[in-house]
Amino acid sequence: MFNNKGRRNVRNNEVRRNVPVKEGETYTVTIEDMGRGGDGIARVEGFVVFVPETQKGETVNVKITAVKSKFAFAEKI
């Protein structure tokens, strides 16, 4: 796609990342690291999921509460 000045429209040419999680789905994950705000960081098929009130090394069942383009939020269940 080109804009009205004959230049490529970068936004339309971006590669869309396949998001492997959906809001409301449940997973069993292991907390691999801790975020700056203290949330645990897990991954589902390499996709980052932030889980509050967890500790590094903990394995928990989670429910996805929000999905963004590069990460998701989940809660322990």
UniProtKB/Swiss-Prot annotation:
Region (Disordered): 1-21
InterPro entries: NA-bd_OB-fold, TRAM_dom
The organism's place on the tree of life at top rank: Archaea
Domain TRAM as annotated: residue spans: 20-77
Comp. bias intervals (Basic residues): 1-10
Biased composition, class Basic and acidic residues, residue ranges: 11-21
Protein name: Uncharacterized protein MJ0660
